[in-house]
């Protein structure tokens, strides 16, 4: 429980602990025993980071009865009146408990504290080195190597969450997010095991500056190092970057496998060599020495697995060596121009490529009057077809031919856009219908001849023609011309049959007129469908 300053210490004045030495020897021995018990209890409480008030008071054993002050004895604490600071009585009792060592505590004028833990953590007496080499307070003798004397304005920051007043040297109890507990074995405890705690202070011993000055440091013990190694194994070895690196290595090994099949094998099917190599140089050397052989070989055949040559021999060994680069992927001829980065399997291809950088065009057109020049002979050969009218590049889908392969490629795009090719008429083949209605087609367009028709058929044809003319005239807004058109057509059809035919033609004309009057309503619906 927390102690109240009112009933226990009615008046505590400002003074020094220097006159505390007049106590009796028995009181000094009792105070020393209490001091040792408090330090042992404090060390035990530190292992739990002193998280509860009960553990605080149990560790420090603040009992004013054992530390009675004489009426004339003064303390290092200024009286603030009853109830000014709840922890002032406990702080005074703790300071009085130090006995002859209170000279290291000094005066205190900082902000008020809410608990005894706050006072003990902020007090300068804990963690400082004694002049004689003895050390007292929160940190034991094993921790003296990292703690030095501080100025009067300094304090210790044991937990990153607590604010701290520090001087030019800062606190050295926290290193890279870890704090020194002062226990045997140089144990470093981390307030949060796997998360970096952002401290509000800026001092020369921050984590970033320690990393920059000393490189990555592992300040933990063996058990912490093992935990860190296990954490690294679970969180870093399965990173996607490591996976892709592993897959890339496997792909490289897969490409550097010798697939040469020994023709002298007796087994069937024959197996390939399947030796794996780490570098291209090792693979090429193996194939050249073990399989291709030296100049004594007279048969230059490629026996690489699934080779498209299918046992067809080369005339010279160097041609076989150049061919094997197709299988191995070797390209030993890089472009020497900076920034290009292209590599080639054949030296002649590199020679041609370098002309793109130099602009050299040594191959001139051999046709008289043409001054075209080319970087390689194959381009010149393609150009020569323009002068000879030779068109060796034929289209496989039609009968057209071209002098240059680029022209053929452009032509092939036409077939790709219209696979069916050219058609005779869109209306006949593509399903398109004519814009002219079937009933409006002129009789002259019919395949049958009007001279071979009977008078009745001629009259019917005249009536149909009159109806068509009438509909067209109505469509143009000329209603009066429909009858004349019908009469003219009727007279024309009747002229082939003499007088009787003329009468029939007249009837046809009148019939055509009636057909115009009667069929107009029937054709109007068709117009609405065709011309909307």
Swiss-Prot record:
The C2H2-type 3, 4 and 5 zinc finger domains are necessary for transcription activation. Belongs to the GLI C2H2-type zinc-finger protein family. Pfam families: zf-C2H2, zf-C2H2_15, zf_ZIC. Interacts with RNF180. Interacts (via the C2H2-type domains 3, 4 and 5) with MDFIC (via the C2H2-type domains 3, 4 and 5); the interaction reduces its transcriptional activity. Interacts with GLI1 and GLI2. Interacts (via C2H2-type domain 3) with DHX9. It is found in: Nucleus; Cytoplasm. Residues 406-452, 475-532 are annotated as: Disordered. The modification Phosphoserine is found at residues 191, 199. There is a cross-link at residue 253 (Glycyl lysine isopeptide (Lys-Gly) (interchain with G-Cter in SUMO2)). This is Zinc finger protein ZIC 2. Phosphorylated. Ubiquitinated by RNF180, leading to its degradation. Changing residue 152 to F: In HPE5; 50% reduction of luciferase activity; requires 2 nucleotide substitutions. A zinc finger (C2H2-type) spans 256-291, 300-327, 333-357, 363-387, 393-415. Residues 100-255 are annotated as: Necessary for interaction with MDFIC and transcriptional activation or repression. GO terms for cellular component: cytoplasm; nuclear body; nucleoplasm; nucleus. The gene is ZIC2.
């Amino acid at each position: 429980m927390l102690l109240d300053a009112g009933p226990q210490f009615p008046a505590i004045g400002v003074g020094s602990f220097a006159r505390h030495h007049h106590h009796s020897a028995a009181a000094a021995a009792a105070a020393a025993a209490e001091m040792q018990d408090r330090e042992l209890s404090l060390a035990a409480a530190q292992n739990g980071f002193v998280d509860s008030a009960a553990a605080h008071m149990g560790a420090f054993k603040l009992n004013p009865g054992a530390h009675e002050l004489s009426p004339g004895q003064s303390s290092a604490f200024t009286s603030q009146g009853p109830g000014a600071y709840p922890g002032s009585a406990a702080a005074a009792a703790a300071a009085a408990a130090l006995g002859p060592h209170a000279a290291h505590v000094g005066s205190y004028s900082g902000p008020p504290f809410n608990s005894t833990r706050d006072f003990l953590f902020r007090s300068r007496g804990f963690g400082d080195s004694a002049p004689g080499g003895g050390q007292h307070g929160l940190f034991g003798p094993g921790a003296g190597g990292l703690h030095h004397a501080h100025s009067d304005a300094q304090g210790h920051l044991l937990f990153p969450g607590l604010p701290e007043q520090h001087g030019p040297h800062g606190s050295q109890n926290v290193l890279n997010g870890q704090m020194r507990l002062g226990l045997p074995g140089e144990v470093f405890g981390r307030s949060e095991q796997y998360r970096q705690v952002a401290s509000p202070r800026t001092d020369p011993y921050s984590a970033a500056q320690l990393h920059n000055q000393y490189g990555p440091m592992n300040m933990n013990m063996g058990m912490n190092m093992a935990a860190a190694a296990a954490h690294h194994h679970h969180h870093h070895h399965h990173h996607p970057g490591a996976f892709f690196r592993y897959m890339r290595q496997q792909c490289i090994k897969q490409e550097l496998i010798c697939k040469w099949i020994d023709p002298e094998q007796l087994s069937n099917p024959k197996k390939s060599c399947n030796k794996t190599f780490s570098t291209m140089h090792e693979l090429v050397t193996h194939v050249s020495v073990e399989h291709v052989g030296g100049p004594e070989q007279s048969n230059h055949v490629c026996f690489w697995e699934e080779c498209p040559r299918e046992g067809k021999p080369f005339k010279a060994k160097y041609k076989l060596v150049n061919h094997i680069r197709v299988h191995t992927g070797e390209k030993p001829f890089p472009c020497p121009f900076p920034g290009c980065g292209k590599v080639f399997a054949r030296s002649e291809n590199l020679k041609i490529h370098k002309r793109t950088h130099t602009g050299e065009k040594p191959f001139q057109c051999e046709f008289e009057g043409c001054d075209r020049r080319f970087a390689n002979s194959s381009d010149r050969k393609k150009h020569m077809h323009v002068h000879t009218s030779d068109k060796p590049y034929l289209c496989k889908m039609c009968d057209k031919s071209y002098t240059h392969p680029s022209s053929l490629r452009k032509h092939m795009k036409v077939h790709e856009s219209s696979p069916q090719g050219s058609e005779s008429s869109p209306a006949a083949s593509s399903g398109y219908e004519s814009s002219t209605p079937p009933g409006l087609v002129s009789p002259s367009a019919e395949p049958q001849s009007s001279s071979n028709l009977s008078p009745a058929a001629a009259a019917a044809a005249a009536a149909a023609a009159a109806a068509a003319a009438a509909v067209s005239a109505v469509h143009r807004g000329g209603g009066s011309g429909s009858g004349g058109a019908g009469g003219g057509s009727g007279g024309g059809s009747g002229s082939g049959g003499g007088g009787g035919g003329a009468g029939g033609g007249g009837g046809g004309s009148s019939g055509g007129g009636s057909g115009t009057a009667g069929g107009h309503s029937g054709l109007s619906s068709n117009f609405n469908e065709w011309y909307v």
